[in-house]
């Protein structure tokens, strides 16, 4: 079983979970970067709001990988404006994950659990999305327990 971890983390919270996934499944890591980096917390919020209002989808700097050799693809992201960051959505549109088992994990301040999962399902209709993990400041979840429950 070959696994990949595709993730973005501005603050390092999502990265910590990505590293746990890598260690447990001996997964390859793919850090997806936006063309223009998001800086501090407050400036990132302002920028995301402006991008949403202007309907500007920022492009990913990271080119879509070839996932043909992978059985499982973990996708990790922070929840921004109740969904997956736009540049990561664009990356996923470019990636061919058809027929792949996709296991998402999301970190959030306080909302977007259902919305981000719905967005992922809409982006990847031909993928099998399982074992969704979500943790937030309001809804704490144990990543180690989640990982132990995943059947590879």
Sequence positions of predicted segments:
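A generic structural signal for alpha->beta connector loops
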Residues: 2, 26, 99, 126-129
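Short, surface-exposed, polar/charged, turn-prone segments marking secondary-structure boundaries
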Residues: 32-36, 55-60, 101-104, 119, ...
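Glycine-centered flexibility sites
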Residues: 12, 76, 99, 109-112
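N-terminal beta1-alpha1-beta2 submodule of the flavodoxin-like/Rossmannoid cofactor-binding fold
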Residues: 1-75, 82-93, 142-152
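Short, glycine-/small-residue-rich phosphate/pyrophosphate-handling segment
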Residues: 103-142
